[in-house]
């Protein structure tokens, strides 16, 4: 008996899109506390609140994400969320005041919550039902791979580069991931 084919060009593209999304996220994650304290003179409590805004926003939108993905067309929602997620890195470059940075952080969390749910849903849609568990497992492995590389690269860059360079690298990773996401056929 032959197994249904898991590795297709579209599956590889969504794996790459997921890795690049999470790499962009994890690249700046360990650097943000330094950025907030050095650029905005934020104290530790403020840094904690700002970083939490992202996660709280992502958690708040996830239940609605599932409903929207079941009600509306999935790929456009995925691409819109991915685009917003990526564009926010450019916003970080331009945020000159802390209140604007906080608003961007909240929108970033909302986009992250939507794009991650949408990505998982699309993986399920484009893979054979007999191999969905395996497909989602490998898809999640891209998160873990980015988690193991991104913070290390981000902290190394913090020692050698400007904050703007780090944000531009996250933006570049997001743009490349968005291109991969656009190429996925559903």
Regions found by a protein language model. Name each.
Residues 7-48:
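Helix-loop boundary and gating motifs at the non-cytosolic
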Residues 41, 73, 94-99:
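Helix-breaking motifs and short loop linkers at transmembrane-helix boundaries and internal kinks
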Residues 55-63, 147-148:
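Residue-level signature of mid-helix packing/kink "hotspots" within the transmembrane helices
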Residues 62-73:
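Helix-to-loop junctions at the C-terminal end of transmembrane segments
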Residues 76-90:
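Structural signature of the two symmetry-related core transmembrane helices
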Residues 99-107:
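Paired small-residue
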Residues 106-142:
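Cytoplasmic helix-loop-helix junction between adjacent transmembrane helices
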Residues 172-186:
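C-terminal membrane-cytosol helix-exit motif in multi-pass small-molecule transporters
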